[in-house]
Amino acid sequence: MEIGSFLELDLRDTGELFDGSEVCRLNLNRAGIYHCCRLLNVNKVLLPYYECFTVRDFLLGKGLKVDYYHIDKDFMPLDISQGDDTAIVFVNYFGLMSTEHMLSLIEGYKNVIIDNAQSLFAKPINGVYNVYSPRKFVGVPDGCYVVGPDAVRFSDEYDQDLSSETAGFLLQRIEAVSYTHLT
């Protein structure tokens, strides 16, 4: 049984967290970061060293170049050198960055992607791409929101992803809880 960042299946109709023409819905956070790179028309991405390896592997698998930058003990970027055709991913680790702090952090950079995988309720920053992963906060098997300028562009080019292949752990949690109450 998987627990980690997965919560119980939630079937309540609570509506969408993000809605509108500047919102694209995809299956995975790493797919959202790739989608942002397509929107930005870049062929290279700067990631912090402290980023999930699945993001790196996914981007490399899509033909993007990946480079890294260091962060300090407070998760702040150190010594970043960004080229013209390069996107930079800033991570809102554990939701610790306020909107004001993020605005000051991204100042002076171009092709900015904010990875809010750990910060579902962080307000999107206007003019850049914000990527969210709801499965770490609510009981859904997968999903990603990309919020930013013309975020839906290219979305019709992707195959429809179905969650039935990846949702088994949510049903196992329900069965496990039911079983423990019966015994």
Regions found by a protein language model. Give the residues of each.
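PLP-dependent enzyme catalytic core of the Aspartate aminotransferase-like
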Residues: 2
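PLP-dependent aminotransferase-like
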Residues: 5-19, 23, 31-107, 116-120
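Active-site phosphate-binding strand-loop segment of PLP-dependent enzymes
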Residues: 72-170
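Non-catalytic, alpha-helical, charged scaffold/linker segments
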Residues: 165, 173-178
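Conserved small/polar residues in nucleotide/adenosyl-binding loops
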Residues: 180-183
